[in-house]
Amino acid sequence: MSRQRPVIGVFDSGFGGLTVLREIVRLVPNAEYLYFGDTARLPYGTKSADTVARYALGACHFLEGQGAEHLVIACNTATALAMDAIEAKANVPAIGVVEPGASAAAAISKTRSVAVIGTEATISSHAYHHALERLGINAYEKATPLLVPLVEEGWTDHPVTKQVAEIYLQDAFVRREQRSDVLVLGCTHYPLIRPLLRKVVPSDVAIVDSAESTAKALAKKLGIAPPSASAAGATQAAGARAQMAPSAPEPKEGTPDFRFFVTDSVQKFRRLGSGFLGHPVDNVEHVDLGG
């Protein structure tokens, strides 16, 4: 691998972290990417904090062994339950998705009140609540677990998904002492239903995508300025071409290079992953990290 380009390891329990990878590639195109999806052991939301931390550390050490120089924990549950352990035991810098999402929401909230949706485990951890509280923001947290299987089913613009979202969010933006004026997407599946959620929440409520916020935070850490709109479009096209020809001997300057690792079905990851990443997913390897 070229030492001229950063090698960035991205970890998630499954597919949702690909939305984070998509945003990172848009801002940091000239890099080599290693993505690890622990698909055999998802969902992490049903596991204990100790188990999640053990799985997450195993994934991080695997990515380090593959040459990762920076780690992105592209999983809200792993960030919420294991970030302290990762920061203490990882051998390279690591960034999670909670702090960037909370910071982005705090920066734009005028009412100083923010709503957060996520999986049961993420919400129960109160990770966003604590992060927002440190920034002087009140948090309204709501677990919305049914949205995850609906996204994986491909029902990103389905009436059933819209109805489920409406039921979950019916109390999120009612008039309280401080009405929430920002909605944080605290699950990496949810960017795929952002247009649908835009129809559900009031028009004056801003939506913050933790994937976008995390990508910006990583780019800032790397000292990389955001590309222009035209450059970003060219990067996405280059990424698609790179996926279609993964065996190219040396990626061109500015072209991302990808390797994907999964602990379960390679075929399923290719099929579902393309929807999350936005272009074909290839160069996928099966790995077994054991218990």
Curated annotation (Swiss-Prot):
It catalyses: L-glutamate = D-glutamate. Keywords: Cell shape, Cell wall biogenesis/degradation, Isomerase, Peptidoglycan synthesis. The active site is at C75, C187. Its EC number is 5.1.1.3. One of its GO terms (biological process) is cell wall organization. Pfam families: Asp_Glu_race (PF01177). Residues 234-257 are annotated as: Disordered. PROSITE patterns: ASP_GLU_RACEMASE_1, ASP_GLU_RACEMASE_2. Pathway: Cell wall biogenesis; peptidoglycan biosynthesis. Gene3D superfamilies: 3.40.50.1860. Residues 234-247 have a biased composition (Low complexity). GO terms for molecular function: glutamate racemase activity. Substrate binds at D12, S13, Y44, G45, N76, T77, T188, H189. Provides the (R)-glutamate required for cell wall biosynthesis. Belongs to the aspartate/glutamate racemases family. PANTHER family: GLUTAMATE RACEMASE (PTHR21198:SF2). This is Glutamate racemase. It comes from Koribacter versatilis (strain Ellin345).
